[in-house]
């Protein structure tokens, strides 16, 4: 059963992201004292008094004429539709504003339980001003200080009381994957095309998607959690504090992923920054699928795809294990193949090989290509065993670990790939001296 869901809603700059972070106990939203900085909704999971629930942080609702603010409003309304309870946040410093009243009108139409909280009540003297917020029509307003965490317990008590009575949490065994790549390679458009719902703000402005958004969906009889990350920016261009934090958070999203979709813009080709972006996922040992997006915009002949694939293999030699797929978020070309590919790579990440079978392959490999000699001393490999998954990790017991040159280690990895299906996942080999 789906967890009960709380959506935090309010006009810009009332402290929604601060409260969201307080509830989750970790910094998930990007907090900056600028209206509109929380550009998209974010999902998280929390617990209060033994009850688990999901939390949605939204961009500020603003009914101004700016197209970007209209998109934020749309995202907030989607979050409202998905929520069981709405936490309507205002702030004591501004008092009841016209924007608060317009937000209230949206919430009246939602016909969902609403808990009204007034943020920035950082000292007792300010509590007397809270009664002005009764005029919003949602009953007793709860005083709250996001900065100090004061009053949050009372707010969460009210939220839990308003949740539906069912309390059946579900263990998350979904396949988690993220989309990484330079800004403006089309990650958000890919997310929308895969989901068929505008869950992520799509804009031609580079760097629009600042946070990682967790979204569950089902396909090919599997449950997936998709984490859409902010584009990783060139170091010289990352000058805003918010963008710097978004890069950090994108890397954390990679750490949370089982599989990473590394997205390249077919129009722009391969850039130096692409290599650094892919390196993050490779070094983290994640499963990787290379997704060439905007393929519909490229003029093609019979050799175009093969030539582009060869270029990728040349520029990303360390990703020789990663499958490549050419797609178009706009036309949805080949997107139907992605879920099955993700499942296959996830299975390969967790594949375990029996030691007896493993050592048969090892002995055959040594017979074909004998171990090298270094300074007159030959490497002797006695046996191999698998010690971990995600990524598959093998220990080879040898007479001297220093004799295992990286070229022979690479040979052994290639032999494992030929014998077993490890497509999409790196393989680690550790040499240990036999005692």
Swiss-Prot record:
PROSITE patterns: G_ENGA. GO terms for molecular function: GTP binding; ribosome binding. InterPro entries: G_ENGA (IPR031166), GTP-bd (IPR006073), GTPase_Der (IPR016484), KH_dom-like (IPR032859), KH_dom-like_a/b (IPR015946), P-loop_NTPase (IPR027417), Small_GTP-bd (IPR005225). GTPase that plays an essential role in the late steps of ribosome biogenesis. GTP 2 binds at residues 181-188, 228-232, 293-296. Residues 4-167, 175-350 form the EngA-type G domain. Keywords: GTP-binding, Nucleotide-binding, Repeat, Ribosome biogenesis. Associates with the 50S ribosomal subunit. It holds the Pfam family MMR_HSR1. HAMAP family: GTPase_Der. NCBIfam families: GTPase_EngA, small_GTP. Belongs to the TRAFAC class TrmE-Era-EngA-EngB-Septin-like GTPase superfamily. EngA (Der) GTPase family. Residues 351-435 form the KH-like domain. The keyword Transmembrane helix does not apply. GO terms for biological process: ribosome biogenesis. Gene3D superfamilies: 3.30.300.20, P-loop containing nucleotide triphosphate hydrolases. GTP 1 binds at residues 10-17, 57-61, 119-122. CDD domains: EngA1, EngA2. This is GTPase Der.
């Amino acid at each position: 059963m789906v967890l009960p869901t709380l959506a935090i809603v309010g006009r810009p700059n009332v402290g929604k992201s601060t409260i969201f972070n307080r509830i989750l106990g970790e910094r998930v939203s990007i907090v900056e004292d600028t209206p509109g900085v929380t550009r998209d909704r974010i999902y998280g999971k929390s617990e209060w008094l033994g009850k688990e629930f999901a939390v949605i942080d939204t961009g500020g609702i603003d009914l101004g004429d700016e197209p970007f603010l209209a998109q934020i409003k749309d995202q907030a309304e989607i979050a409202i539709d998905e929520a069981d309870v709405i936490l309507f946040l205002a702030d004591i410093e501004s008092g009841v504003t016209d924007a608060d009243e317009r937000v209230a009108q949206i919430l009246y139409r939602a016909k969902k339980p609403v808990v009204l909280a007034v943020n920035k009540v950082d000292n007792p003297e300010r509590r007397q001003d809270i009664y002005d917020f009764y005029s919003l029509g949602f009953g007793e307003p709860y005083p709250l200080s996001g900065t100090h965490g004061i009053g949050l317990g009372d707010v969460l008590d009210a939220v839990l009381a308003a949740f539906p009575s069912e309390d059946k949490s579900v263990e998350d065994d979904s396949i988690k994957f993220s989309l990484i790549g330079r800004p403006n390679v089309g990650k958000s458009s890919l997310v929308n095309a895969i989901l068929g719902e505008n869950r992520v703000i799509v804009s031609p402005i580079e760097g629009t998607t600042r946070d990682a958004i967790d979204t569950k969906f089902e396909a090919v009889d599997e449950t997936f959690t998709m984490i859409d990350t902010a584009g990783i920016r060139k170091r010289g261009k990352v000058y805003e504090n918010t963008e710097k934090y978004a890069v950090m958070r994108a890397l954390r999203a990679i750490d949370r992923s089982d599989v990473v979709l590394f997205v390249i813009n077919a129009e722009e080709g391969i850039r130096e920054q692409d290599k650094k972006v892919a390196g993050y996922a490779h070094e983290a040992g994640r499963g990787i699928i290379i997704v060439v997006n905007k393929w519909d915009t490229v003029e093609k002949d019979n050799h175009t795809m093969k030539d582009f694939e060869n270029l990728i293999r040349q520029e990303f030699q360390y990703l020789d294990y990663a499958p490549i797929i050419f797609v178009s978020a706009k036309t949805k070309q080949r997107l139907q193949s992605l879920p099955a590919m993700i499942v296959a790579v996830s299975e390969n990440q967790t594949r375990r090989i029996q030691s007896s079978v493993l050592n048969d392959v090892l002995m055959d490999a040594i017979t074909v290509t004998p171990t090298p000699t270094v300074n007159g001393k030959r490497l002797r490999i006695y046996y191999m065993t698998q010690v971990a998954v995600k990524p598959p990790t093998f220990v080879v017991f040898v007479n001297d670990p220093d004799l295992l040159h990286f070229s022979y280690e690479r040979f052994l990895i290639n032999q494992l790939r030929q014998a077993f299906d490890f497509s999409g996942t790196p393989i680690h080999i550790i040499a240990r001296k036999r005692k």
